[in-house]
UniProtKB/Swiss-Prot annotation:
It is found in: Cytoplasm, Nucleoid. Pfam families: YbaB_DNA_bd. One of its GO terms (molecular function) is DNA binding. This is Nucleoid-associated protein SMU_394c. It comes from Streptococcus mutans serotype c (strain ATCC 700610 / UA159). NCBIfam families: DNA_YbaB_EbfC (TIGR00103).
Length: 99
């Protein structure tokens, strides 16, 4: 019975630590960039788009495809950074589970 109580205490402590790390991650800013930094997308750690900036050189009404491609590139770059940070932050807890 004592073991079960200890496991529950450990699980609660771990849950609080995880919540703290998730909160820290959510408050972080991630900046994704396209080739030559022509498009820059900024996200929070919980994957909310904060801003997107287009350099004048990429804004060409006759070439929308390049702008679209670079926008996707910048967004995917930022989301990849968030995923990496999430894995590093939250993956550390996987081996600490008391069961």
């Amino acid at each position: 019975m004592m073991n079960m109580q200890n496991m529950m205490k450990q699980a609660q402590k771990l849950q609080k630590q995880m919540e703290k790390k998730q909160s820290e991650l959510a408050s972080m800013t991630f900046v994704g960039k396209s080739a030559q930094d022509l498009v820059v997308a900024t996200f929070t750690g919980n994957k909310k788009l904060v801003s997107i900036d287009f350099k004048e050189a990429v804004v060409d009404p006759d070439d929308r495809e390049t702008l679209q491609d670079m926008t996707v590139q910048a967004i995917n770059d930022a989301l990849g950074q968030i995923e990496d940070a999430t894995q590093k932050t939250m993956g550390a807890f996987a081996g600490k589970l008391p069961f």
